[in-house]
Regions:
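Catalytic phosphate/metal-binding cores of nucleic-acid and nucleotide-processing enzymes, i.e., regions
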Residues: 1-93
Length: 93
C-alpha cells in the first residue's frame, strides 16, 4: 500500500471524528511530521506516515526525539489499522 493511500485514509478518519489533519511542510526544518492532527477533544498530534516498507530518515528520527523531549504527541504510522488504533485511543482519552 502506498503512503499516499495511508495519508488519505488518515485525513478522512480524522475528519469523520470531527477533527482536522493539516498537511505540514517546513522548508527550513527537514524531518518534520507529514500531518498535524487536531482532535475535537483538544489533543494535537504530529503524525508521520509511511508505506509498510518505509523507513524514517535520520532527520525524522531527530524530530521524533525532539517531540518526545518536549512532551508532544507524536506517532509514526504504517497502516490503516495503526491509524484506527491510535485515533480511537486518542479520542477516547
Amino acid at each position: 500500500m502506498k503512503e499516499k493511500i495511508i495519508e488519505k485514509y488518515l485525513v478522512q478518519r480524522v475528519k469523520d471524528l470531527g477533527g482536522r489533519a493539516y498537511k505540514f511542510t517546513s522548508p527550513a526544518h527537514r524531518g518534520v511530521a507529514d500531518r498535524v492532527v487536531c482532535l475535537p477533544n483538544g489533543q494535537t498530534w504530529f503524525i508521520e506516515l509511511k508505506a509498510p516498507d518505509g523507513r524514517l530518515s535520520e532527520m525524522q528520527k531527530i524530530f521524533a526525539s525532539d517531540m518526545a523531549l518536549m512532551n508532544q504527541k507524536y506517532a509514526c504510522l504504517w497502516s490503516k489499522e495503526q491509524i484506527d488504533g491510535r485515533i480511537i485511543e486518542a479520542v477516547s482519552n
